[in-house]
Amino acid sequence: MRLENLESKISVIESAFAGGAAGAVTRAIAQPLDVLKIRFQLQLEPIRSGSKYSSIFQAVSSIIKEEGVTALWSGHIPAQLLSISYGLIQFSVFEKLTQICQIADPQFYLSHKHGLNFCNGAIAATVATVASFPFDTVRTRLIAEQKTNKAYNGFINAWSVMIKQEGSRSLFKGLTPTIAQIAPHAGIQFAVYKLLSENILNRIDFFQRRSSMSVTVESSLLGNLLAGSLAGFVSKTAIYPFDVVKKRLQIQGFQQHRSAFGKQIYCSGTLHCIRLTISEEGLLALYKGYGPSMLKAVLVSALHFAVYDEIKHLILKMKP
C-alpha cells in the first residue's frame, strides 16, 4: 500500500522552515486585524454608538486619528516572533506525527485519517503554544497599552519589566484557557483543511493542481486558500470565547495603563473571568470582537495553509 505524498518527501527541518515563513508572511498582512480584535475583546462597554470602539471602521479611524497608522501594527515584533516560532514548531510537529502514523500502521492511518489529523493538529498546536506563549503575552500588552500612557518602551523593555515587576510567570498569564482553546481549534482546523484539500476540492477539476509533485491529485493554490478559509471559520467560531478570556487574563495587573479605554475587568483566573464577564456584560460578551476576529481567522488560516503548501512545493522543485 503506497502512502507516498507531499508530506512523506519533506523533512522535519524543511517543514519547520515552511511553517515559519508562512507565519511571517501571514502575520505581516493580518496584524491590523489582530490589533482590532484585541482592542474589542478588552473593551468592557457594549460595542455600540458612544463606546470607545463601536464598529470596525470607527475603530480603525479612531486608532489612526489618536495614535497614528503605525498603531495598527502595535506589537508587531513580538507578533512576528510569535508567528514564526509557532508556525515552525506547529507544522514540523504535525508533519512528524503524521509520518509516524503512516509508517507505524498504514491501514489504520488511512481508516482513521481525519481523526488522526485532528489529534496530531491538537498536539502540535499545544507544543507550539507553550513554546511561543511569552511572545503572545508581550504582544498583547503592547497592543493593549494606551499610547499616551505607555508602560513599555518596546518589546525587550516590556519583556524585562514584566519579569522584574510581576515575575516570570506573568509571561504565561492566560496559558490555561489558551491551551483549552488552541488544542481543539487547531485540531478542527487541520482536520477540516485536510478533508477539503485532500478529499473534496482535489476531486473538482477547477481546484486541481496542474503540476503536482505527488502521486495523488492535489488541490491548487486557489483550492488551498478556500480550504484554509473555511477551516479558519469553523475552528474560530467553535472556540472563540476562550480567546476573549485569554486576552482579559493577559492584561491583569496592567489596568492602570488602559484607563482611557473605559471600564477595566479584574479577575483572578479562568472561571472567575468567565463568570464576571457573563454577569457584568452578558453571554454575548464572550463573542466581543468576533467580526474582526473572524476576518482575521479566515485570512490567516487561508494564507497560513496555502503559503505553507506552496513553499513545500517550491522546496520539492528545488530538489534534484
Q: Which residues fall in each region the model found?
A:
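Periplasmic/extracellular loop-to-transmembrane helix junction in inner-membrane transport proteins
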Residues: 63, 67-69
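Specific transmembrane alpha-helical segments of multi-pass solute transporters/efflux pumps
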Residues: 79, 83-91, 189
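Residue-level signal for conserved functional micro-sites within the alpha-helical transmembrane segments
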Residues: 26, 83-86, 128, 300
